[in-house]
From Swiss-Prot:
Keyword Zinc recorded: no
GO molecular function, one term: glutaminyl-tRNA synthase (glutamine-hydrolyzing) activity
Keywords assigned: ATP-binding, Ligase, Nucleotide-binding, Protein biosynthesis
Organism, as annotated: Gluconobacter oxydans (strain 621H) (Gluconobacter suboxydans)
Protein name: Glutamyl-tRNA(Gln) amidotransferase subunit A
Subunit composition and interactions: Heterotrimer of A, B and C subunits.
Keyword Ligase in annotation: yes
Cystine bridges: none
InterPro entries registered for this protein in UniProt: Amidase, Amidase_CS, Amidase_dom, AS_sf, GatA
Recorded name of the encoding gene: gatA
GO biological process, alphabetically ordered: translation
Amino acid sequence: MSGIHDFTLASARDALKARKISAVELTNAHIDAIERLDGQLNSFITRTPDQAREAAKASDEALAKGEGGSLCGIPLGIKDLFCTNGVRTTAASKILGNFVPPYESTVTANLLKDGAVFLGKLNLDEFAMGSANLTSAFGPVENPWKRKDSDAKLVPGGSSGGSAAAVAAGLVLGATGTDTGGSIRQPAAFTGIAGIKPTYGRCSRFGTIAFASSLDQAGPMARNLQDCAILLESMAGFDPRDSTSVDTPVPHYEAALKRGVKGLRVGIPKEYHVEGMPAEIEALWQQGMTWLRDVGAEIVEVSLPHTKYGLPTYYIAALAEASSNLARYDGVRFGERVSASTLDGLYEASRAAGFGDEVKRRILIGTHVLSSGYYDAYYLRAQKVRTLIQQDFLKAFENVDVLLTPTAPSGAFAQDEKPTDPVQMYLNDVFTVPASMAGVPALSVPAGLDARGVPLGLQLIGKFFDEETLIAAGHAIEQAAAFHHRPTIHAGVSA
């Protein structure tokens, strides 16, 4: 079965429909890989092999009748921020403990309706707050990649680090992620895979545990953009249970791969040439411009003048929303519960014990910026600047079709290289946050390796609800980059 782990999601779909492989075979191979490798990677919080085998058996029965949806028999992993009916959902936090939702998130329900097989729930930064998957109550996730000159354990990025690591290592054919300020794109870049943050409102947030409600957006993570396109078409769609869901048709995203980019105007934001950017990141960015120019795109410099305010604005607006969203967790019904002599004391002690340090830091900051006397100075001002950031993008898109930037300011760093200053960690999102603040779609594609053999990604940012053009441009980069490298730890590599 060694060849099974060479499948992409698209090629596995085609093989299943042609009956060249059974869903049970495919699922068992991935379950075996998880059992073999995830003790080291720690990409899963909860595994569901028995349910997966039952679902695979049902998929084979459907396929034998010529039935089944677009994902029939495809083994996926689900970020443990999506509520899954009857399966533990933790948000990687002790405060949720062994919470088992009695309902299904819309995104996962859509995937199940199309026949997907869920292998389990994937690790993440606690409540999706982090850029390195180091804040999980269930331990850090290890990036399956290694540097050429070191055996140090690398971070997979965050917050969707478990999703990224599982896809990169071949433990799943695709995974769900969420992106609030870069949590799909940055880990995709760190692990050499593709990831799409759709337009805000494209995928329903119903049943997804909230971090920052005006920013959170679900999206796909997979080996390449074709696989991401297949997943996104299933995940997306209007949902009346989410007041921010937008009622607009979902295109056939996979068809966008054939569109080509001749005549496409690609904007290069001059403000993204940040001080101290490593030479190899700058060189990769220039290479990306060359690749697109070579297939007929036009490169145009643009200005996003409020870029420098992106991070501080994000860390005011997002943390304010987080402090409000996380106020509901009290330790009474589930999760970490600490006894106290009064009800208020129980709340305080349970929250102090149940939340990790990074989450508590963000709750404190968010509560402060919303407090009397500081609301106008911080939160209200941040919302006004956020509008200016969005206007920057709208103005740029009057002249160009997409924007091209690096995804992250570096490749993956070692787990023990974590900066002690949280602000330094927040800088990992410097290139991804502005698109989140504007609500526009963005994606990351693997484009090369750094000098130490670790993946680097390029980011494309698009117009509202124009994920198709992003996918077409991203596919052009994929074809030119020909990124076929495999990480050190991979299901297809013999132990």
